[in-house]
Amino acid sequence: MLSTSSRSFKSKFRAAFWPVHNYELGKFIPMSALMFCILFNQNILRILKDSILISEISAEIAGFAKVYCVTPAAALFVIIYAKMINRFTFEKIFYYLSAFFISFFVLFAFVIYPNIHVFHVHPDNLADWMERYPHFKWYISLVGNWGYIVYYSLAELWPNIFYVLLFWQFANELTTTEEAKRFYTFFSLFGNSSLILVGFLMMNLSSEDTIIKKFMSISDSKITLVQVSTTIVAIVAIVCCVLVRFISKNVFTNPLFYAKAKSGRSTSERMGLIKSFKYIAKSKYLWLLLICSAAFGFAINLVEAVWKAKIKELYPTVNTYAEFNSLYILWTGVAIMVMTIIGNNVMRMHNWFVAAVISPVIIMVTGILFFVLIVFDQQILSLFDGAILMSPLALAVSIGGIQNILAKGTKYSIWDTSREMLYIPLDDELKTKGKAAVDVISAKVGKSSSGLVQSIIFTLVPTATFTSISPILMVVFTFVCLAWIYAVRKIYFEYQKIA
């Protein structure tokens, strides 16, 4: 009796804290390592792109870059990817895309950025044109600072291409629905631990007492930061390619790990590009997925835009901005790991809807609190006169940081793993090209729609700032979050029909 009870306890303990069987480690470990490396690079690039663009230009320019540069680039990528998937294996696509992105990042770090005065319009001429045409000043700034804009755009595309699309497409092909319920939360747990490592690493590299000084003299700290960070990104990208090669040759060919190993991975003829998108357009399921992903991008970008403008006021240089950003990334990693464990148990004990709706609810509540602080800052400070021991600016940055940590923590743990389960029961066409369209385009549509709202306001009112337009952004933010919750509810009903 005791033995049976003991085995039952061990079984329940294993199911809760380590549901991966020993014979599955040959599949689980390399996939977790691949996710770790992709997210490692993603977060270094996230720190660099914001630190460079916002410190070198302004926070307002980010919205224009997302609308007029990032979104067109994302749309172009989806078209190219749909062509590539008909001609190349996943392995080759991963190599080609890695080579393209890393080549530009290296070119920027070692050629363009150190000689930015050669490649960009002279600041005095740019300022003169912007003053002469105030309604078009941000568009002039986009063109005049093209190097920063291209770097920002490619760094923005990295997470949607390499993590959301390529990694999860790889994982969805390799993993069954039953395995996904056990694996995906732990992929997220191990993969997102990279944020903590990146946080500590980039805090050191961007600080005045950086370890780099022990190995080389530093003439310009911001250029050294970008060059050292880019070198690390390039090395980790090579490791990613090695892992993809290993998984393709050793996991996909093993019947123990992959059910289709004996017959080979699907080689059935794919639809043409036009026919493929017509097929996707008819899917209500994918349209709901698109709304959910776009809503996150839209909502979080509204909050982040205001928050990042406040960060620049407090930390005006590239290195100080990067150091603060690194601290934020570190705590985001901690939040993701904690919420991943919570999400795993929520998903096991409740239905998919309960787990999936956590993200939009938390983002809406914390986002509204942040906007209330920005809009009614003087009233709040006078109400708590003497009780708040920091400046209004420092308080806004701190509260915004907490909001973003909680929002990203729930999104990258609970929501991402919940969303990926929605693709598993789909057919191959929707699982590949449909996923590409939803994952790459939707997030950028969300962010660019948010950026479009901001860009229209800044174009019509050149003197506007993020602080002055915060009341408008708060109303839009609330509406978008409610639409996201509604879409999650609707897609849950669709998922139940096919799962």
UniProtKB/Swiss-Prot annotation:
<feature type="transmembrane region" description="Helical">
    <location>
        <begin position="356"/>
        <end position="376"/>
    </location>
</feature>
<dbReference type="GO" id="GO:0005524">
    <property type="term" value="F:ATP binding"/>
</dbReference>
<dbReference type="Pfam" id="PF03219">
    <property type="entry name" value="TLC"/>
</dbReference>
<feature type="transmembrane region" description="Helical">
    <location>
        <begin position="93"/>
        <end position="113"/>
    </location>
</feature>
<dbReference type="GO" id="GO:0005471">
    <property type="term" value="F:ATP:ADP antiporter activity"/>
</dbReference>
<keyword id="KW-0547">Nucleotide-binding</keyword>
<comment type="function">
    <text>Provides the rickettsial cell with host ATP in exchange for rickettsial ADP. This is an obligate exchange system. This energy acquiring activity is an important component of rickettsial parasitism.</text>
</comment>
<feature type="transmembrane region" description="Helical">
    <location>
        <begin position="380"/>
        <end position="400"/>
    </location>
</feature>
<dbReference type="InterPro" id="IPR004667">
    <property type="entry name" value="ADP_ATP_car_bac_type"/>
</dbReference>
<dbReference type="GO" id="GO:0005886">
    <property type="term" value="C:plasma membrane"/>
</dbReference>
<feature type="transmembrane region" description="Helical">
    <location>
        <begin position="327"/>
        <end position="347"/>
    </location>
</feature>
<feature type="transmembrane region" description="Helical">
    <location>
        <begin position="148"/>
        <end position="168"/>
    </location>
</feature>
<feature type="transmembrane region" description="Helical">
    <location>
        <begin position="61"/>
        <end position="81"/>
    </location>
</feature>
<keyword id="KW-0812">Transmembrane</keyword>
<feature type="transmembrane region" description="Helical">
    <location>
        <begin position="286"/>
        <end position="306"/>
    </location>
</feature>
<feature type="transmembrane region" description="Helical">
    <location>
        <begin position="183"/>
        <end position="203"/>
    </location>
</feature>
<protein>
    <recommendedName>
        <fullName>ADP,ATP carrier protein 5</fullName>
    </recommendedName>
</protein>
<keyword id="KW-0813">Transport</keyword>
<feature type="transmembrane region" description="Helical">
    <location>
        <begin position="25"/>
        <end position="45"/>
    </location>
</feature>
<keyword id="KW-1003">Cell membrane</keyword>
<keyword id="KW-0472">Membrane</keyword>
<keyword id="KW-1133">Transmembrane helix</keyword>
<feature type="transmembrane region" description="Helical">
    <location>
        <begin position="223"/>
        <end position="243"/>
    </location>
</feature>
<feature type="transmembrane region" description="Helical">
    <location>
        <begin position="468"/>
        <end position="488"/>
    </location>
</feature>
<keyword id="KW-0067">ATP-binding</keyword>
<comment type="similarity">
    <text>Belongs to the ADP/ATP translocase tlc family.</text>
</comment>
